[in-house]
Amino acid sequence: MERKSRKVRTGRVVSDKMDKTVVVAVDTLVKHPLYGRTVRRTRKFMAHDEDNQCRIGDKVKIAETRPLSRHKRWRVAEVLERSQI
């Protein structure tokens, strides 16, 4: 039985106050079912940041992984862009 490919998302870090954990906001564009307008939906994921390298505003790529805690199922794969703060 082959293993399914893991999901990858891109988003912005909105919180880095926890040790080795960041909160990443991921935006997706969804078409409204009745009116047809494209609407932005935002979802927040807790992601594991082993080296505490991410800061608020960084653009990061997160990858799905095994459950690391009650809320963490994602890890930071790479930092795509540093924030200018």
Curated annotation (Swiss-Prot):
Gene Ontology cellular component annotations, sorted alphabetically: cytosolic small ribosomal subunit
Query: From its record, what is one biological process in GO terms?
Result: translation
Keywords of the record, alphabetical order, are: Ribonucleoprotein, Ribosomal protein, RNA-binding, rRNA-binding
Question: Is RNA-binding given among the entry's keywords?
Answer: yes
Q: Name one Pfam family in it.
A: Ribosomal_S17
Gene3D superfamilies xref list: Nucleic acid-binding proteins (2.40.50.140)
GO MF terms on file? rRNA binding; structural constituent of ribosome
Q: Where is the signal peptide?
A: none
Hydrolase is among the record's keywords: no
Q: Provide the family line.
A: Belongs to the universal ribosomal protein uS17 family.
**Which function does this protein serve?**
One of the primary rRNA binding proteins, it binds specifically to the 5'-end of 16S ribosomal RNA.
- Assembly notes: Part of the 30S ribosomal subunit.
Q: What is this protein called?
A: Small ribosomal subunit protein uS17
